[in-house]
């Protein structure tokens, strides 16, 4: 059950990070649209207006957060991949080949994949 608990905790953390990542991306898109609308509406406005500096700073900070969350998701996905790979390597040879490439799946898909294969991990842990 040790592997199962570790996988469950990693999946919960990955889900939380994925939610933060989506919030950052949605905020980036929304603020980017607002920034563009303000810029187009005030063509003759002075570019040193504080609202432009504030929006630029917010866009930069959200972009940095989104990149950090993406890197964290990749690291956690690889940790999940290694955990499942070590737990299930003796159960099914085909499963090991699939897992070799599964760490390159887009973020979130590996989490769903892990939940589907968790029964194999439980079997390996009980052996």
Swiss-Prot record:
The chain crosses the membrane at residues 13-35, 57-81. The keyword Membrane applies. It is a multi-pass membrane protein. It is found in: Cell membrane. Keywords: Cell membrane, Membrane, Transmembrane, Transmembrane helix. GO terms for cellular component: plasma membrane. This is Uncharacterized protein MG055.2.
